[in-house]
């Protein structure tokens, strides 16, 4: 454990941020899995709605600094490609 007051505070702050980021990433993975399940099932209308939900969450994660903007753009692009590849 750190001895300096400011480093002790940073340890606590970093832990709070880590837990918050973990929750955001977990929600992203959950919504992304739901989207991919709908694509596999062939339900295009529901998949489109779910993609909008997931894309919005990716944008929010970028705004919060959880993800890099290029990472989110890549994931949204792949989701769009999967959606467009549906019959």
Swiss-Prot record:
Gene source species: Corynebacterium urealyticum (strain ATCC 43042 / DSM 7109)
PANTHER family tied to this protein: 30S RIBOSOMAL PROTEIN S20, SMALL RIBOSOMAL SUBUNIT PROTEIN BS20C
Pfam family, one: Ribosomal_S20p
InterPro entries in the cross-refs: Ribosomal_bS20, Ribosomal_bS20_sf
Record's keyword annotation contains Ribosomal protein: yes
Family as reported in the entry's similarity comment: Belongs to the bacterial ribosomal protein bS20 family.
Superkingdom field: Bacteria
Listed name of the protein: Small ribosomal subunit protein bS20
């Amino acid at each position: 454990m750190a001895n300096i007051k400011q480093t002790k505070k940073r340890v606590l702050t970093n832990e709070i941020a880590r837990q918050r980021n973990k929750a955001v990433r977990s929600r992203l993975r959950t919504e992304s899995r739901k989207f991919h399940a709908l694509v596999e099932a062939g339900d295009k209308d529901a998949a489109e709605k779910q993609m909008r939900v997931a894309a919005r969450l990716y944008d929010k994660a970028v705004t919060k600094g959880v993800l890099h903007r290029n990472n989110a753009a890549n994931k949204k692009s792949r989701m769009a490609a999967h959606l467009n590849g549906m019959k």
